[in-house]
Design a protein with these regions (language model features):
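Short amphipathic alpha-helical coupling segments at ligand-binding clamshell hinges
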Residues: 74-87, 92-96, 168
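Bilobed periplasmic-binding protein-like "clamshell/Venus-flytrap" ligand-binding domains
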Residues: 89-100, 179-184
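A bilobed periplasmic-binding-protein/Venus flytrap-type ligand-binding module shared by bacterial periplasmic
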Residues: 61-75
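Short, well-structured alpha-helical segments that form the helix of a local strand-helix-strand
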Residues: 20, 165-177
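Short beta-strand->loop
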Residues: 45-60
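Extracytoplasmic ligand-binding clamshell segments of periplasmic binding protein
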Residues: 1-41, 51, 78, 82, ...
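Long, aromatic- and glycine/proline-rich binding clefts that accommodate carbohydrate-like moieties
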Residues: 49, 98-150, 157, 182
Length: 184
C-alpha cells in the first residue's frame, strides 16, 4: 500500500477476526456471525457500519439456509420441519442473534423483549438488519463455489498487482463460461 499501513497482498478471511482483535488491522469486513465474539473479546471500543457506497448502496446476503432433501423419508422431513420451525421462531431467532451476532431471521425476532433490550444496549446489533434495505441477491449459479473462487482469485490478482482488473476479470469470465457451458 502507498502508506505502508498494512501488509502487501490480501488478508485471509479465516484470520481476519483474530488480526482485528490483536490490533493488526483497523477495519474488517466480515460476517455478522463474528459480532458477538468481537464484542466479548475486543479490549477496545469498536463500531459497526453499513458498507460504503459509491453511486448506490448494496450489500450481499447469504448465510445459514435450511434444506430438506427430496430423498429424505417422511419421518425425516417432518423432523426437519420441526427443527426449522423451532430455529426460526421469534424467541429462538432472537437468542441465536444475541449468541452469535447473526441477524434475527425475521422481523418478529426483533419484537421479542430480549432482542429489543439487547439492541437498545448494543446498537451495532441492528446495522446488518438495517442494511437489508439495500440487499442484493446472493450470487447463486450452478457450481457456485467454483465460480465464486474464480471471482475471488481475480480480485486477489488485481489487488496484488499480478494482473490489471480488466485482465483478471476477463480471465475469470472465460473460465466461468467454460465451467458453465454444459449447463446452458
Amino acid at each position: 500500500s502507498k502508506h505502508n499501513v498494512m501488509p502487501s497482498g490480501t488478508i485471509e478471511w479465516g484470520t481476519l477476526r483474530k488480526n482485528f482483535l490483536e490490533g493488526k488491522t483497523a477495519i474488517m469486513w466480515h460476517s455478522t456471525g463474528n459480532l458477538t465474539t468481537v464484542k466479548k473479546n475486543a479490549k477496545f471500543d469498536f463500531g459497526v457500519a453499513m458498507l460504503p457506497e459509491s453511486k448506490r448502496r448494496g450489500t450481499p446476503t447469504g448465510g445459514g439456509n435450511f434444506y430438506i432433501f427430496k430423498q429424505s423419508s417422511d419421518e425425516e422431513k417432518k423432523a426437519s420441519m420441526r427443527l426449522i420451525k423451532f430455529m426460526t421462531s421469534p424467541e429462538q431467532a432472537a437468542h441465536w442473534s444475541m449468541a452469535t451476532g447473526y441477524m434475527g431471521v425475521s422481523p418478529s425476532s426483533y419484537q421479542t423483549e430480549a432482542l429489543r433490550n439487547y439492541v437498545k444496549d448494543f446498537p451495532p446489533a441492528v446495522v446488518a438488519r438495517d442494511q437489508l434495505n439495500y440487499a442484493t441477491a446472493e450470487l447463486s449459479t450452478f457450481q457456485t463455489g467454483r465460480v465464486r473462487k474464480l471471482l475471488d482469485d481475480a480480485i486477489q490478482s488485481a489487488l496484488t498487482g499480478n494482473e490489471s482488473p480488466k485482465q483478471a476479470l476477463e480471465k475469470a469470465q472465460k473460465s466461468a463460461e467454460r465451467l458453465l457451458r454444459r449447463y446452458q
